[in-house]
Amino acid sequence: MIEIRNLSQRFEGPRGWIEALHNVNLTIPQGEVFGIIGRSGAGKSTLVRTINLLTRPSEGNVFVDGRDLTQLSAGELRGARRDIGMIFQHFNLLSSRTVFGNVALPLELAGVKRAEIEATVLPLLDLVGLAAQKDRYPAQISGGQKQRVGIARALASKPKVLLSDEATSALDPETTRAILDLLRRINRELGLTIVLITHQMEVIKDVCDRVAVLDAGRVVEEGNVIDVFMRPHHEVTRALIGDVIAQELPPAMKARVAERLKTGSGHLLRLAFTGSGVDQPILSETIRRYELDFNILHGQIDEIQGRAFGSLAVLATGEPGKVGQAFAYLREQGVVVEELSYVE
């Protein structure tokens, strides 16, 4: 549905050229909720704005539904953009228009007849839960409701793609969850492809199918969300996941473990489980089979894409030969085993 090929973006700054994006390649299938995450300045917003050519790339191509947007004329591009809705962190509603009027605005500008506008807008307001607020003005509704208006307005032209640029970052956690639930429902009911930009891994965990991690304008990691959480490879990904699922021990415990590791006593492990593995007595079975001691230092259970996900930090001790066999057994059971070290 969306394909980004060899895309780079440069801007001229006071100290010379700045490369905001470097050779980005992504493929986003139709009907997927795809997350793009990174720290501030990673290039996320620049990337999402190239998908509808609000920002034209310096190099590369952007294909949406098989059409290369970079090769379209101005008129053709305007037509193609009708298939791409967009919502932003700031709601950009007209204070002089009602909720209905704000959602209807793009249709009015496109010359759509009044009867057709009503037939389009009223179901959208019902979809986003604002049918009862249709005659209210922006000053009379909450921030979460304003974002729902923005979503309905973005859907008014019946797009195939919805771009979300930090759409929940200005909202409180409860409202954020409600908006994410709404986006997921829209994805399911309308078959809409959603590209979601965020700096919050919690958002990725709750709503996305796949994720790309952006750092300094480069895609440093990409994959299914559950796989990225279980097997993060890049240090930026690890740091972002650590914002949601603790990856580090408390400092005092870390110091004690480091001293113990220096003596060669034990192995510090991060174990990650998913699905049925969370409910199975895998650790106790490993202890019985291989006569190991597991000291659990830290643990957490969460849910990703509706599947249970568990993460443990353990200190394992036992006979060297049996330790290796135990690690192999754990991996056979679908457990991700990562040996850590805090020794400087």
UniProtKB/Swiss-Prot annotation:
Single GO MF descriptor: ATP hydrolysis activity
Catalysis performed (reactions): L-methionine(out) + ATP + H2O = L-methionine(in) + ADP + phosphate + H(+); D-methionine(out) + ATP + H2O = D-methionine(in) + ADP + phosphate + H(+)
Record keyword GTP-binding present: no
Domain ABC transporter: start-end pairs: 2-241
TM region positions: none
Pfam family, one: ABC_tran
UniProt entry keywords in alphabetical sequence: Amino-acid transport, ATP-binding, Cell inner membrane, Cell membrane, Membrane, Nucleotide-binding, Translocase, Transport
Entry membrane topology: Peripheral membrane protein
E.C. number(s) listed in UniProt: 7.4.2.11
Annotated residues for binding of ATP: G38, R39, S40, G41, A42, G43, K44, S45
Major subcellular location class: membrane
InterPro entries from the UniProt entry: AAA+_ATPase, ABC_transporter-like_ATP-bd, ABC_transporter-like_CS, ACT-like_dom_sf, MetN_ABC, MetN_ABC_transporter-like, NIL_domain, P-loop_NTPase
Assembly and interaction partners: The complex is composed of two ATP-binding proteins (MetN), two transmembrane proteins (MetI) and a solute-binding protein (MetQ).
Protein family: Belongs to the ABC transporter superfamily. Methionine importer (TC 3.A.1.24) family.
Protein name: Methionine import ATP-binding protein MetN
